[in-house]
Amino acid sequence: MIITKKRVTEQKRTSHTARLFGLHFPMRLEPAVYGLTENMSEDYSGAYWDFWELSNGGVYMSPRSDERFNVSCMNYYAGEMSADALGITACLYAYSHLSFGKERQFTDTCIQQYHWLRDYALDHDEAGEIFRAVY
């Protein structure tokens, strides 16, 4: 089954993330994604982010940019990615890190989101780079 993505409109961003993550989105998930992105890429210096909804139930964010980013990760990956691939990578890292928390409902949501996003990333044009960065 092919997993597709659809941009979440400006009008629905807040309600969409609140429905999925509650207050954890603006307080924990969103800052984690931004911080991880800054740590992974010296080329990244802030951006407007698009929110994406996946046909399998997953969600992710990516910087709105046509630029490519040099990326290096703690697993010794070093390479170049599009903004979309960078966003997927940062969200996979964030979902993984946050899945070890104490609030069961939020951690379960992060676990499920990780798996849905990973499934989408398997067919991404930059799947090789994404998975070298994550694993």
Where are these regions (language model features)?
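Low-complexity intrinsically disordered segments
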Residues: 2-13, 22, 99-135
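A structural signal for well-ordered alpha-helical scaffolds and beta->alpha junctions
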Residues: 10, 30-33, 85, 110
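Hydrophobic, Leu/Ile/Phe/Ala-enriched alpha-helical segments that form helix-helix packing faces
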Residues: 21, 37-41, 92, 99, ...
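Short, charged/polar micro-motifs that form catalytic or ligand-binding hotspots
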Residues: 7, 37-41, 74-81
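Extreme N-terminus nucleophile/cap motif
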Residues: 14-28
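Amphipathic, interaction-prone secondary-structure segments
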Residues: 25-68
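Compact, glycine/acidic-enriched structural inserts
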Residues: 72-109
